[in-house]
């Protein structure tokens, strides 16, 4: 599989094809002969990293969170996107008895409502996906009760999102003596610290699942009910 990947990159990825055309004396079959890739190279000319067998406008445009530095724009084929979602359903959600038909909520930074808005809703609901999308940009002490009302109205079974945003919402609920029970809370994009986990578990009366992964789809890991990764 590695050799197939190296062969494809050498012949079909413009960035690497240009590299190996210049250094023909080196064997591309040996991984140690490949150049170390840095983010600046990708951000400078992202089109050089798209397989020539694909049309950029027919690919899914994603981006990294920038947890370790500069975020990246990525282009992913739709088969890989489907596999990614299937893996998440099977490996993460199913372990916590979360069905693919369960309504769910996500906290993210998409601007689903104007940033200056001071009155609800601070969310949108996707009926096709049974998804409640909550804006991370409006979570504050003055809006906590509004978020709780949205959770009660749409009754999601799990919550996914940025660790810090979920922690902030959990803390607000605790300060107002409120609890909203879920099957699980799944954190992403940021590390999960013990003090955050304690508040999230208390506010949502459920286990917290920490995930580690990359939008680049290089690797993925998550915590299991037994506490192991």
Where are these regions (language model features)?
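Active-site glycine/GP-rich loop and adjacent strand/helix microenvironment
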Residues: 126-229
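A short secondary-structure junction signal
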Residues: 74-76, 116-118, 171
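Nucleotide 5′-phosphate-binding alpha/beta core
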Residues: 1-63, 69-103, 110, 149, ...
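Short, flexible, solvent-exposed loop/turn segments with mixed acidic/basic and small polar residues
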Residues: 62-63, 122-124, 176
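Conserved AMP-binding loop of ANL adenylate-forming enzymes
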Residues: 93-125, 134-137
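Basic, gly/Ser/Thr/Pro-rich low-complexity segments located predominantly at protein N termini
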Residues: 71-74, 113, 194, 218
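Short, solvent-exposed polar/charged micro-motifs at secondary-structure junctions
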Residues: 41-44, 114-116, 219-221
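Loop/helix-junction capping segments adjacent to catalytic residues or to phosphate/diphosphate-binding pockets
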Residues: 82, 113-114, 141, 194
């Amino acid at each position: 599989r590695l050799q197939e990947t190296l062969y494809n990159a050498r012949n079909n990825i413009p960035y690497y094809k240009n590299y190996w055309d210049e250094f023909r004396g080196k064997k591309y079959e040996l991984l140690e002969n490949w150049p170390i890739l840095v983010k600046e190279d990708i951000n400078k000319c992202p089109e050089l990293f798209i397989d020539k067998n694909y049309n950029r406008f027919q690919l899914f445009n994603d981006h990294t969170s920038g947890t370790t530095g500069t975020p990246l724009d990525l282009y992913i084929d739709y088969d890989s996107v489907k596999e990614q979602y299937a893996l998440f359903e099977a490996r993460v959600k199913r372990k916590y008895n979360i069905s693919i038909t369960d309504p769910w909520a996500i906290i993210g930074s998409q601007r689903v409502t104007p940033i200056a808005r001071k009155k609800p809703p601070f969310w949108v609901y996707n009926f096709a996906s049974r998804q409640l999308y909550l804006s991370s940009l409006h979570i504050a002490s003055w809006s906590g009760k509004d978020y709780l009302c949205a959770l009660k109205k749409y009754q999601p079974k799990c919550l996914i999102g940025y660790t810090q945003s979920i922690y902030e919402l959990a803390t607000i609920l605790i300060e107002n003596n409120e609890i909203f029970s879920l099957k699980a809370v799944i954190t992403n994009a940021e590390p999960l610290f013990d003090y955050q986990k304690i508040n999230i578990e208390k506010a949502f009366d459920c286990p917290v699942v920490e995930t580690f992964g990359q939008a680049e789809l290089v690797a993925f890991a998550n915590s299991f009910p037994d506490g192991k990764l």
